[in-house]
Amino acid sequence: MRGKFITLEGIDGAGKTTHLRWLEYFLKERGKNVMVTREPGGTPLGEALRDILLDSRQTMHAETEALLMFAARREHLDKVILPALSRGEWVISDRFTDASFAYQGGGRGLSLQKLNELECWVQGEFQPDVTLYLDVSIASGRQRTSNIRQADRFEKEQDEFFRRVREAYLERAKEFPERIRVIDANQSLEDVRRSVEKSIATIYA
């Protein structure tokens, strides 16, 4: 039996890592074989591209950024995600294609047509079974990440960039309401966990 593919999305500080690890535990407790991965990354090539993409010393054209993201994603699908799903494993990914529409589309201003073409080329009709978008205010996200580590190339962007990213995520959620579940990540930890559990209830039965 094919496994399930769950993705978590949100700006930095939304709590993706925290809730991803809880979700991994939650599913394992219910007898699921779970693989956790991330984007960009997940493969040796993907991790090398991640280092380039996040390096705050790097500058690149927005289209270059998008192409590198989708190149990493193609490898990720081929080497990690699709084989795991075919083995019946449940795959949880910290970000996937919705992030490209939010960051490169909303944030960088790339046309949705170009991103749609890349999406179709790289993954065809393949989509996550469910996407959890953790929606947090930009101020809260900044506050949560301010003292964690040195900011990467994306985290150094101005608030206006993240406003566009957040708006793009919300527009994407309106476009695909059956797949993308918007969760208020400004809530308490327990309330967010309850929302996550409710959002995946239809696929883990």
UniProtKB/Swiss-Prot annotation:
Top-level taxonomic group: Bacteria
One GO MF term: ATP binding
Entry binding sites for ATP: G10, I11, D12, G13, A14, G15, K16, T17
EC number, UniProt record: 2.7.4.9
CDD domains linked: TMPK
A single GO BP: dUDP biosynthetic process
GO cellular component, one term: cytosol
InterPro entries recorded: P-loop_NTPase, Thymidylate_kin-like_dom, Thymidylate_kinase
UniProt keyword terms in alphabetical order: ATP-binding, Kinase, Nucleotide biosynthesis, Nucleotide-binding, Transferase
Reactions the enzyme catalyzes: dTMP + ATP = dTDP + ADP
Pfam families the record matches: Thymidylate_kin
Family: Belongs to the thymidylate kinase family.
NCBIfam families, per database record: DTMP_kinase
HAMAP family: Thymidylate_kinase
Protein's job: Phosphorylation of dTMP to form dTDP in both de novo and salvage pathways of dTTP synthesis.
Listed name of the protein: Thymidylate kinase
